[in-house]
């Protein structure tokens, strides 16, 4: 059936455009004109090939994939520029100003006071930023990201404000001289920068939900380690181990791409040798002869580093718990009392011994390269001035021992402060001192050996202690890339594996301790009392649901009470058979749809005759004449037939689900609308598809009776058109009342924008809790619906499950 020639307003992205419809236009072609191409579901091309929607989705997928790689390249490039700039500020501004500040006087006592004042002032400023401006910038940032990547999205952790204040806070805290690092904040900054870029228009489409956004942020975390140590491969592995529980292989390539782009950017920016911040870590060892004595020494070093790592974590936990129970003690002094006390103590202990007040990069360089003949030998042999008879290696043994003890305690205390901090670099320096300590002992035991190099032991110790504390084997790859030397590859791997194994036997990693202390949700921490716990024991029985046959008032009241993104749909209140789930956004659109119908029914209805241009004044006069003379008994049969057909077109325009594409809808959530012109005239919309009769025939929830009556009376020449229009409006008013029953399943069949997920995650009441936890971790869902023979009996929410566990422990 073809439509007669008439003008129609077609919904488009920029409003309504006038389209002339020819006489031979079929209803199916007219439907394709009215409906947006991307929203036509199930319509095949004339050649019987792939549907138009499938083609558009294929193009969208290719474009989306291109934007993903473009986004990763942008993060790698911009992140490398940003982080290198921060490093240069540390080198040429913060540390230079500190030396200049201390050189204002040659008096030792005044220099001592200047060093204390500098440390206290910068640490207090960093604490002020955290407490008063941006609390989300506190700490390492890795535990928060770990919680996000496990499925608990927290937008405040990666907000754009965090990017700025985390950087400023880190400049103050790290520049103060506290025993902290910067790799954790660098990873956090990389993720925050990535999330900020995702808010830019070209990249909005690639992060359509929290899960996809989290995957992209996880891929960008490798940039932080690549910028800190110049280690793209180790950075990727570390980001996987430190922030992930289960990892997608597709994200593996993205992380490598981001880290590679970042590494290239860093190499270009630091091409000037004077700006190469990593050159001091390069080593050049002679070939290693792994004899039995040295092999045993490396094994002992790995075990020792594992024990020290566990001791460090236990010390941190005890200090944190003590501060938590005595928080009022510090508040009585000053809001920043704990920071002032720790900063002052750090400065007092560090200044007297030169090697203790070195920044961590210089300390590591000294441990890796200092020999009796090197230029920096006096740094670690400073204790030898106590006696002229003390050999170099005896002095350095004592220096390393003091460095390990003091730095281990200061680091454990410093990471309990409310400031931005990292943990990897100070552990790196402490581990190098432990390795150097063992190497110097080996040299004392075997003074005639020409194959023992204490500096090589320092490299192994640095990797082993970091691996034991963070439980990351990637520490081995980071140290090998950092030193650019594979001579000690086997001892490094051996030490890291032994250290991680010893640590796992004794306690959790330092990042897991951060997670627990901050009470962050994290599924792997969930521990059931016994394997006998099943879904019935932990499910929530107080249910919110919507019945298949419901009313607008019931939907409105339900939306006011629930916070979930989706609501289960059941057959009825009696049997509670689970049909599926529907999003709260869709329910809001259902209400908005009926409100639109209500508003249109109240507006004056005017009808355009077939073949009349609605923007033509003459044609508008004809329309008005038709309306004003509807009751004229002298009208000919053609006019009566035309007017009666117009009435049916009004009903059909309201009945059919014509989607309007609004410019104000940023999310492109298409809500049904009836096209009208500027004079509130409903435009004719005879768009029944003969090949898809169900689309129009099933659309009878609101004015089906009126529609049929108009069709039956279509050839009646004596119909009063004004009365028909009024009857249409009255029927619409009745159909959209708040107590009118709405069949959601029927609406889904009739409207492509109403989507009911007919296969939500369902579990039986007898499923063990350990399996439920595993499902949450692997599938990434938020809610599991508990059913018994299809009947909805409860829900298990991931967030509530974790919060219950945190409250118990």
From Swiss-Prot:
Compositionally biased region (Low complexity): 620-646
Membrane topology note: Multi-pass membrane protein
Cellular compartments annotated: Membrane
GO terms classed as biological process: chloride transport
Transmembrane stretches, start-end: 66-86, 110-130, 152-172, 218-238, 246-266, 295-315, 333-353, 395-415, 425-445, 459-479, 486-506
Family annotation (InterPro entries): CBS_dom, CBS_dom_sf, Cl-channel_core, Cl_channel_volt-gated, ClC
UniProt-recorded Gene Ontology molecular function terms: voltage-gated chloride channel activity
CDD domains: ClC_1_like (cd03683)
Assigned protein family: Belongs to the chloride channel (TC 2.A.49) family.
Protein name per UniProt: Chloride channel protein F
Residue ranges constituting the CBS domain according to the UniProt record: 539-597, 756-809
Primary gene name: clcF
Keyword entries, A-Z: CBS domain, Chloride, Chloride channel, Ion channel, Ion transport, Membrane, Repeat, Transmembrane, Transmembrane helix, Transport, Voltage-gated channel
Start and end residues of each stretch annotated as Disordered: 604-646, 692-729
UniProt function note: Voltage-gated chloride channel. Chloride channels may have several functions including the regulation of cell volume, membrane potential stabilization and signal transduction.
Keyword check for Transcription: no
Cytoplasmic-side positions: 1-65
Pfam short name (any one): CBS
Any single Gene Ontology cellular-component annotation: chloride channel complex
């Amino acid at each position: 059936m073809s439509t007669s020639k008439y003008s129609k307003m077609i919904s488009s992205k920029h409003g309504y455009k006038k389209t002339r419809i020819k006489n031979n236009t079929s209803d199916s072609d007219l439907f394709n004109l009215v409906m947006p191409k991307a929203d036509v579901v199930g319509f095949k091309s004339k050649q019987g090939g792939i549907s138009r929607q499938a083609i558009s989705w294929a193009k969208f997928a290719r474009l989306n994939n291109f934007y993903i790689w473009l986004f990763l390249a942008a993060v790698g490039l911009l992140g490398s520029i940003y982080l290198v700039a921060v490093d240069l500020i540390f080198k040429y501004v913060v540390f230079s100003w500190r030396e200049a500040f201390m050189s204002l006087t040659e008096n030792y006592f005044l220099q001592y006071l200047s060093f204390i004042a500098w440390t206290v002032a910068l640490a207090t400023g960093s604490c002020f930023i955290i407490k008063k401006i941006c609390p989300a910038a506190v700490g390492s940032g890795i535990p928060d990201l770990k919680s996000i990547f496990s499925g608990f999205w927290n937008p405040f952790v990666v907000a754009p404000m965090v990017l700025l204040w985390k950087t400023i806070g880190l400049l103050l805290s790290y520049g103060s001289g506290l025993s902290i690092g910067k790799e954790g904040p660098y990873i956090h900054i990389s993720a925050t920068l990535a999330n900020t870029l995702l808010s830019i228009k070209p990249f909005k489409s690639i992060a359509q939900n929290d899960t996809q956004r989290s995957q992209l942020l996880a891929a960008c975390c490798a940039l932080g380690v690549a910028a800190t140590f110049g280690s793209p491969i180790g950075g990727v592995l570390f980001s996987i181990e430190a922030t992930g529980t289960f990892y997608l292989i597709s994200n593996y390539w993205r992380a490598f791409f981001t880290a590679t782009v970042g590494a290239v950017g860093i190499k270009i920016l630091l091409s000037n040798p004077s700006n190469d911040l990593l050159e001091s870590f390069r080593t050049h060892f002679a070939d290693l002869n792994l004899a039995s004595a040295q092999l045993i020494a490396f094994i002992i070093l790995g075990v020792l580093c594992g024990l020290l790592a566990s001791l460090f974590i236990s010390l941190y936990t005890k200090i944190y718990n003590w501060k938590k129970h005595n928080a009022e003690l510090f508040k009585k002094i000053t809001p920043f009392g704990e920071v002032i006390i720790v900063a002052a103590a750090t400065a007092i202990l560090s200044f007297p011994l030169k090697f203790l007040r070195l920044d961590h990069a210089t300390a590591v360089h000294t441990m890796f390269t200092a020999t009796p003949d090197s230029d920096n030998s006096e740094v670690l042999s400073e204790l030898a001035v106590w006696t002229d008879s003390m050999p170099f290696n005896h002095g350095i043994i004592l220096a390393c021992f003091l460095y390990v003890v003091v730095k281990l305690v200061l680091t454990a205390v410093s990471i309990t402060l409310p400031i931005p901090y990292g943990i990897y670099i100070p552990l790196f320096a402490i581990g190098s001192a432990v390795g150097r300590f063992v190497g110097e002992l080996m040299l004392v035991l075997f003074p005639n050996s020409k194959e023992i190099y204490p500096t090589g032991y320092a490299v192994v110790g640095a990797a082993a202690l970091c691996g034991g504390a963070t439980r990351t084997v990637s520490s081995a790859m980071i140290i090998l890339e950092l030193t650019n030397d594979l001579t000690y590859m086997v001892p490094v791997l051996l030490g890291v594996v032994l250290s991680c194994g010893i640590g796992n036997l004794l306690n959790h990693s330092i990042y897991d301790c951060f997670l627990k202390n901050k009470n962050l949700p994290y599924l792997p921490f969930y521990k059931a009392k016994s394997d006998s716990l099943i879904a019935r024991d932990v499910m929530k029985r107080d249910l919110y649901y919507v019945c298949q046959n419901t009313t607008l008032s019931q939907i409105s009241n339900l939306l006011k009470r629930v916070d979930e993104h989706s609501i289960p749909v059941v057959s009825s209140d009696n049997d509670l058979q689970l049909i599926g789930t529907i999003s709260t956004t869709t329910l809001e659109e259902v209400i908005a749809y009926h409100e639109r119908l209500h508003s249109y029914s109240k507006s004056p209805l005017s009808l355009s005759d077939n073949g009349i241009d609605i923007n033509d004044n003459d044609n508008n006069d004809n329309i008005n004449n038709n309306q004003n003379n509807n009751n004229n008994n002298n009208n000919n049969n053609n006019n009566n037939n035309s007017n009666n057909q117009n009435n049916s077109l009004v009903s059909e325009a309201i009945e059919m689900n014509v989607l309007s594409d609004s410019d104000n809808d940023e999310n492109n959530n298409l809500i049904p609308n009836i096209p009208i012109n500027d004079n509130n005239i409903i435009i004719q919309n005879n768009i029944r598809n003969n090949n898809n009769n169900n689309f129009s025939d099933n659309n009878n929830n609101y004015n089906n009776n009126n529609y049929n009556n108009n069709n039956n009376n279509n050839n009646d020449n004596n119909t009063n058109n004004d009365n028909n229009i009024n009857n249409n409006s009255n029927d619409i008013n009745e159909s959209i009342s708040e107590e009118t029953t709405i069949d959601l399943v029927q609406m889904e069949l009739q409207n492509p924008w109403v989507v009911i997920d007919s296969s939500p995650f369902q579990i039986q009441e007898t499923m063990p809790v350990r399996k439920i936890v595993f499902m949450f971790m692997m599938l990434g869902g938020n809610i599991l619906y508990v059913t018994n023979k299809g009947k909805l009996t409860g829900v298990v929410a991931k967030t509530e499950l974790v919060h219950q566990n945190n409250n118990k422990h």
